[in-house]
């Protein structure tokens, strides 16, 4: 009897695990320039214009993010630097990127088996982005404004636009003193007015977090739907002469 109960428990546990299916992410570069895609977890991949990268992510993955790096130069061993989004000088990222970089963030199979996903500008902005579930029943997030071109002078950075937290490093902008310790500012409103669905500061949750279930996802750099048929967008501020 005891063995039967144990076997039933193990079978039930395995069944629950199997129902929490993994998700596939298609990462597509529709920019007119090369983007070095990065993912944590996942690593990194050079994407020339029109190229894509398929990433299979395990069920239950959380605190995950995908971003694009610009103006990179890597040697044959995958060591080098990027102007924006650099992750410790490696093509294959094992940690998070250096601001400024537009982020697609997600956590799979969380509360009530829901996926949580968002676009965040808390680390600033470098590339316009779409983050969308393949399910038509869930919300498509877009951040395609010309933030680099309109960036306030104090937030400007080579190749992108910093979030004020990166520049000032105070609770007013970083919310380091906990929930309710900060609110929107003139700088967060600059981002929010241009990308209403994206996080503009760390406690911008109510209008910036979305949920879906049982779906795969697409992350698109320079999505064409809002940029015209060619998918053109202002190039990063400084382009390297040799791309690896």
From Swiss-Prot:
Pfam families: Thaumatin. Disulfide bonds join 31-222, 72-82, 87-93, 138-212, 143-195, 151-161, 165-174, 175-182. Residues 1-22 form the signal peptide. GO terms for cellular component: secretory vesicle. It comes from the Eukaryota. Belongs to the thaumatin family. PANTHER family: OS03G0233200 PROTEIN. This is Osmotin-like protein OSM34. It comes from Arabidopsis thaliana.
């Amino acid at each position: 009897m005891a063995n039967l109960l144990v076997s039933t428990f193990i079978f039930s546990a395995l069944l629950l695990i199997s129902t929490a299916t993994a998700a596939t992410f298609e990462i597509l570069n529709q920019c007119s320039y090369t983007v070095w895609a990065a993912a944590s977890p996942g690593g990194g991949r050079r994407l020339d214009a029109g190229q894509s990268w398929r990433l299979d992510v395990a069920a239950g993955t959380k605190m995950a993010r995908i971003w694009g790096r610009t103006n990179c130069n890597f040697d044959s061993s995958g060591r080098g630097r990027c102007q924006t989004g650099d992750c410790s000088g490696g093509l294959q990222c094992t940690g998070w990127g250096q601001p400024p970089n537009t982020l697609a963030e997600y956590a799979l199979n969380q509360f009530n088996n829901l996926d949580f996903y968002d676009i965040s500008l808390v680390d600033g902005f470098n590339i316009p982005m779409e983050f969308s579930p393949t399910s038509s029943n869930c919300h498509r997030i877009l951040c395609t404004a010309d933030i680099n071109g309109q960036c306030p002078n104090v937030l400007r950075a080579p190749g992108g636009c910093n979030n004020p937290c990166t520049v000032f490093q105070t609770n007013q902008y970083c919310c380091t003193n906990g929930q309710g310790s900060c609110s929107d500012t003139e700088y967060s409103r600059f981002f929010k007015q241009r990308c209403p669905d994206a996080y503009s500061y760390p406690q911008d949750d109510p209008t910036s977090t979305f949920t879906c279930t049982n779906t795969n996802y697409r992350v698109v750099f320079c999505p064409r739907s809002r940029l015209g048929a060619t998918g053109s967008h202002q190039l990063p501020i400084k382009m390297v002469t040799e791309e690896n």
